[in-house]
């Protein structure tokens, strides 16, 4: 495949989590093109919390980008670029579900939107969950639900779960541990 080269980049917006750029690209045929690019500055982590009975905890929350309630695994941005993703996953588990775990295991990494964003999410499996206390952020509103892995797989294929990180986590877990 012939090489595409970035020949320039203009910052269009800088926010607390992302920066938005227009990239100026030189195409193999000599033409130039403009591509939008979103840089997720801190990175993120997510966690698939598995209860002792084998069920999985999920959260429902409103997502403005898709203007609907989304069923997802707990996740969030790292506090800084130096925060280990396992610490971020552990924090998000307790903040969002009210459970904690000392047994987090790396499951998979996913690039969420390769066409225009560099966001990568490390996803962890949490077992041996212990009840704790939910610590939602001031403007974070979500509910916690419990589902069997089979229910979640069916919800993926029926379109009830559309969040990419959650789909990847559930299917990776099912493939690795439930076969």
Summary of predicted features, one role per range:
Residues 9-12, 109-113:
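Short, solvent-exposed loop/turn elements at beta->coil junctions and helix N-caps
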Residues 2-3, 38-41, 46-48, 52-91:
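Conserved Nudix-box catalytic region and its N-terminal flanking loop in Nudix hydrolases
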Residues 8-46, 52:
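Acidic, metal-coordinating catalytic segment for phosphate/diphosphate chemistry
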Residues 58, 73-106, 124, 136-139, ...:
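The catalytic Nudix box helix
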Residues 20-24, 48, 58, 123-125, ...:
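Conserved hydrophobic/aromatic beta-strand scaffold that supports enzyme active sites
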Residues 29-30, 51-55, 62, 127-131, ...:
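Short loop segments at secondary-structure junctions
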Residues 24-29, 113-132:
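Active-site-adjacent beta-strand/loop module that shapes the phosphate/pyrophosphate-binding cleft
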Residues 1-7, 69, 125, 139-179:
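Nudix hydrolase/Nudix homology domain
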């Amino acid at each position: 495949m012939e090489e595409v080269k970035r020949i320039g980049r203009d910052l269009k917006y800088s926010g607390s989590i992302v920066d938005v750029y227009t990239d100026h690209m030189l195409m193999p045929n000599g033409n130039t093109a403009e591509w939008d690019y979103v840089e997720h500055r801190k990175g993120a982590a997510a966690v698939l919390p598995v209860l002792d009975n084998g069920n999985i905890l999920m959260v429902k929350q409103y997502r403005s980008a898709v203007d609907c309630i989304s069923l997802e695994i707990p996740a969030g941005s790292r506090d800084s670029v130096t925060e280990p993703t396992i610490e971020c996953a552990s924090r998000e588990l307790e903040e969002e579900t009210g459970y904690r775990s000392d047994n987090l295991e790396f499951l998979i990494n996913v690039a969420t939107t390769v066409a225009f964003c560099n966001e990568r999410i490390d996803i962890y499996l949490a077992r041996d969950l212990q009840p704790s206390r939910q610590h939602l952020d001031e403007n974070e509103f979500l509910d916690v639900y419990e589902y069997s892995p089979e229910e979640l797989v069916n919800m993926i294929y029926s379109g009830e779960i559309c969040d990419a990180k959650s789909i990847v986590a559930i299917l990776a877990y099912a493939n690795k541990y439930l076969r």
